[in-house]
């Protein structure tokens, strides 16, 4: 079965066609980065206008690259949460209209389920496993029992790791997108130059949680206080030390989840899953089977949305055409699986 998936939750206009939840027939992503770089971040109004301008040609290109016409597609899917409301509405409205006009079943897909599924597009991964979902909006550690069944173990109590990367890059005028730039710049610096603080959340409900607001503040406003003797305060050293601290924070919480659950397969997803230091740090743990999506599937893409929708289709479910967009999802709670936060309606 072939599913056409649309993703427009932020600043990428994307469409892909995936067969049987695995075989990517086409995967088109139109990036808006050049339009947002001068503002050092995403401007929601610009993002939604570009989505409206690009959505039709992107969908047409996806069909063309797959050598299909719409009649040969079995279902239509689109992201409906979370994200920028204007951006979500463009892709969701287009997807619902396309499904209605073509007489195809429609599926609204949670963006975060998509990121968690991305690695499944190129790997056969049995459930359950420990999921690490790290992006510009989320930092989640979960026990993943199924494609739409995530048992949340820990999350950020303030900023996401991706947001911290972007804010640090913006303050030091490094450019946008911050995560990619810091990753590259860090290779020129020394991660031992600064000893930045990390929150002590070792017990009880916060055992698996992370926090990045304090780290972000230290890097931006108090860097001099954490500079080690014999090192210079260069942007490369700041980038390397910040990245090292952020990644070690994530990995330390992840290892706790591995120890407590006994699960040794770790699957990552989201934009920050492309970070080279995070990948290398996890690779050092030979006792783990760490699976990352290809770099092209770490960022926003339609293939992950189509992949998730295929499993809803196979299960005989559909989303009503009055499905709405939702900019935010309820605060993740420990033990919450696919109820409030991952609801599609």
Where are the model-predicted features located?
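Conserved phosphate-binding catalytic cores of ATP/NTP-utilizing and phosphoryl-transfer enzymes
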Residues: 1, 109-130, 308
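Short beta-strand scaffold segments in enzyme catalytic cores
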Residues: 13-19, 131, 139-143
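DPxDG-like acidic metal-binding loop motif
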Residues: 83-102
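Glycine-rich phosphate-binding loop plus the immediately following alpha-helix
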Residues: 146-190, 216-217, 221-225
